[in-house]
Curated annotation (Swiss-Prot):
It is found in: Plastid, Chloroplast. The gene is ycf19. One of its GO terms (biological process) is nucleoid organization. Its main location: plastid. GO terms for cellular component: chloroplast; membrane. The lineage of its organism: Eukaryota, Rhodophyta, Bangiophyceae, Bangiales, Bangiaceae. This is Uncharacterized protein ycf19. It comes from the Eukaryota. Keywords: Chloroplast, Plastid. Belongs to the ycf19 family.
Length: 95
């Protein structure tokens, strides 16, 4: 009995689901950044910052700011969405 396709399917599905949850967290952080009253040193905002900042720092500085706004999170979101599409397509083909 070959369990590799089932295991691979489960692994790729888990990575795709994790990427989707992470994308929602990034979008939540970017939406909250528009509100000046959010104190990023209090919970739950501090945890949200600690979870999303390492990933977003990878892309910071890769795109110059436009109109005073940092556009590098867009690159991170596009990369994460590409990963989700790839993992979902590979998962569907291996089923």
């Amino acid at each position: 009995m070959n369990t590799l396709p089932g295991t691979l399917n489960l692994l790729l599905g888990s990575i795709a689901n994790f990427s989707e949850i992470y994308l929602i967290l990034i979008l939540l952080k970017l939406s909250l950044a528009w509100f000046p009253t959010v104190n990023w040193y209090n919970e739950p905002f501090c945890s949200l910052n600690r979870i999303t900042d390492p990933y977003l720092k990878l892309f910071r500085g890769s795109i110059p700011p436009m109109f005073g706004m940092d556009m590098s999170p867009m690159l991170g979101i596009i990369f994460l969405q590409c990963l989700m599409v790839i993992f979902n397509n590979v998962r569907l083909e291996s089923a």
